[in-house]
C-alpha cells in the first residue's frame, strides 16, 4: 500500500523522532511510506485561536495527499479536524477524508495488527486521547 504520512505540526516542531518512528513502523509492515513536503498544518491551532476559515488548509491537504492509498497521522486531534471539519468546507476533500486514519486505528482496523514485535525494558503508559475517544470513537 502506498501511504502518505501526515505529520502534525507539533510533532514536526517538538518531537520529530515520533514522525520517524511512525514511518519506520508502517514500513515494517511492508508499506511504501512518503512524506509529502507540500503538507501543512491541519488548521486546528488556527481554529483554537478563534479563526474559523480553514478552507485553505483543506485544499492544501487534498492536493498533498490525493495520490495515496491511505493517509496516516499519529494524532487523533488532527484526524478529527480533517474528518469533521474538512467535509463542511469543500466536497473535493471527501475522497482524501475517507482514507485518512489515526495511526493506531490504521494498525488495528486496516492492517489487523494484534501486537507489535519488540521489547522494552521500561514500563509504558498509554494515553487514550480525548479526541480519539470522543470524536473518532477509538478505544
Question: What kind of region is each of these model predictions?
Answer:
Residues 1-139:
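Iron-sulfur cluster-binding electron-transfer modules in prokaryotic oxidoreductases
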